[in-house]
Amino acid sequence: MKRPLIIVALAALAALLLPLVLPWGHAQIDWDHVRAGLMEHGHMLGTDDLGRDRLARLLVGTRTTMMVAFAAALVSLVIGTIWGAAAGWIGGRTDEIMMRIVDGLYALPFMFVVILLMVVFGRSILLVFIGIGAVEWLTMARVVRGQVMALKSRPFVLAAEAAGSPGRSTLIRHILPNVAGVAIAYLMLTVPQVVMVESFLSFLGLGVQEPLTSLGILVNEGADEMDMVPAALLLPGGILVTIIICLTLAGEKYRDHLAQQASR
C-alpha cells in the first residue's frame, strides 16, 4: 500500500509546489512563442496553440483533478456516514424507508444527474465536487449501515447502553470509531472513481472553467494535437491513469488488510 500512496503523494507535492517556482503561470500567454517545442524559449514542455506553458498547465491540471477528487470523496464520506449510521442505528421502518430512498437513487443514471446539476447551476469547481460527492455517497451509506447494524448488538455496545449512555452518545463514541476503518477503505476506493468522473466531465466541457484547467481538459486538448505533439495527450493521460491505478491499488490493499484483521 505504501508505494502507490508515495507516488500519489509525490504527484500531489509536485502539483502544489512546482507552479510556485515556474517562470510562467498556467494561464499566462507567451505571444512571441506560440507552439514552442520542448525545451524552447524557457518552456520545458513547450507551449500550446495559445502560447500557454504546457508544464504549468499540466501541474495545475493535476492539482485541480486531485483537489476535486479528494474534496468530492470527503463530501460522499460525510453524507454517506451520516445517512448510513442513522439508518442502521434507528432500524425498523425508518431504516427501511431510508434505504429504499438509496435504492431509488441508485436506479437514476448517475452521469446524467451530474451533468444536469452542471447545466442547471452552472460550472464552478465548488459545484463540481459538491455535485459529484452528493451522488457518490450511496455505496458509503450502505457500507456504514451494515457495519452499524452488526456492531450495535455487540457486548461493548450493550454494556454502554446498560450503563445509561444515551443513544446518540453510544453511536458517536462507541460505534462510529469502529466503523472508521471500513469507511476509510471505501473512501480510498471512491477517490479514483471521482477522478474518472471529474476527468470525463472536464473532457466533455462540463467540468472546471478556464482559466483553470484539469487533466480531463488537457486530455481533450491533447487529442486534437496528438498528430503534431503526442506529448500533449500522452503526459496528462499517463498521469491520469497512474493516479487512478495507484489510488485503486492502495484502497484495495487497505481493504484486504482490514479483512485479514477482522478474520483473526
Locate the predicted segments by residue.
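C-terminal transmembrane helix and the adjacent membrane-cytosol boundary/short C-terminal tail
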Residues: V135, G181, A185-V191, P230-R264
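Non-cytoplasmic
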Residues: I115-L116, S124-F129, G133, A183-I217
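Amphipathic cytosolic juxtamembrane alpha-helices at the membrane-cytosol interface
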Residues: R52-M67, A71, G91-M99, M149-S153, ...
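Generic hydrophobic transmembrane alpha-helix motif, especially the helices
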Residues: M44, D48, R54, G88-W89, ...
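Hydrophobic alpha-helical transmembrane segments in multi-pass membrane proteins
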Residues: T64-G80, A107-I115, P177, G181-E198, ...
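Transmembrane-helix boundary motif in ABC transporter permease subunits
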Residues: L18-V21, V68-D103, I115
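N-terminal signal-anchor/first transmembrane alpha helix
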Residues: M1-Q28, I101, V179-A180
